[in-house]
Amino acid sequence: MQSKTGTFPSIETRNLEGRAFRLPTDFEGDLNIIILAFQRWQQDIIDVWAPHLDALAARHTGVCIYELPTLANRYRMVQRFIDGGMAAGIASREARERTLTIYTDKRRFLAPLGVTDESTITLLLVDRQGRVVWRGSGEYSSATLASLEAAIASPTP
């Protein structure tokens, strides 16, 4: 399902290179593709999406991609271990720079985004003001990619 509603909540985090971010203010694109993941195995879904999203961003100026593994607050005390393990497993510096782990009260974080299903990944297209202008989820499909590209090509004001 591709719908558009919601606002990205304000949250502080770091990427896997250690750079601090205050989101959504620090999203760098005019439009930002946000990949929310909730379980380790969902990285396999992201890995299938990644080359398609990279190609899409390359075709559209001002589009940036961010991966946001989203974990409950209780994991914050082992944040260095989790982030270090993720960073060690990602060879690409670019991928580490765009991966920002979120440690938070997931219900409070996900509610404004309209995300209720953590059984798969969620894809969001977020503008500079933090507005969600498109939403999709799940395994890669050419139809979902086409819907995302259409939203990028003609964003709503």
Positions of PLM-derived features:
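Short, solvent-exposed coil/turn elements at secondary-structure transition points
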Residues: 17-19, 71, 105-106
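Thiol-/selenol-based redox modules, centered on thioredoxin-like
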Residues: 111, 118-157
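Structural microenvironment flanking redox-active thiols in thiol-disulfide oxidoreductases
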Residues: 42-92
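Short, internal strand/loop/helix patches
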Residues: 66-68, 81-117
